[in-house]
Amino acid sequence: NMVVFKQTLPHIPAMIEHISHGDGLKLQLIQFMPELVGQQEWMVDIDSLKKWLELRADKVLVREMHHRRIYLFNGAEVEVVDPVYNAEFCMNCHRIRVTHQGELKGCLNRNDDLIATRGLDDDGLRDAFRKVVANRVPFYGAHVKNFPRRDSRTAVPIEFPGLPAA
């Protein structure tokens, strides 16, 4: 896994080159989520990165979960996890997550829906799971309204210094 933001972006071609020589390696490029941690200026145009991958990959597949593209490079998989303002990701998400502190989380894009599980018995855990499912909100809700909307139709391939254009 590699979080994609301005400081890690230049290392992506080398990471892809590295995994393309391994057997069964997979690189998940995870979109930086400033709405959760701040630092919006670190954000990268993830759609431009996806265009770059699409132009260079040997083959592109589509995963059912989140309807994510899988870019194949010499058999190695590169997958972009891009949930920020991505309705397609949300529409195809059926996951409940568990945080490092054991809290249940119904949406990757939110931290205001956490349900504590510490100390719960079996019945309490069942109730917690039911509650997290009942509290799910499609497409993030309004709590991220201060961040720009995405339009992947206008994306152009990102350029990496020293690498030829596709």
Could you describe each region identified by the protein language model?
Residues 1-79, 83:
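Radical SAM enzyme [4Fe-4S]-AdoMet core and its adjacent flexible, acidic
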Residues 86-166:
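Flexible mid-to-C-terminal extensions adjoining Fe-S/redox cofactors in radical SAM and related proteins
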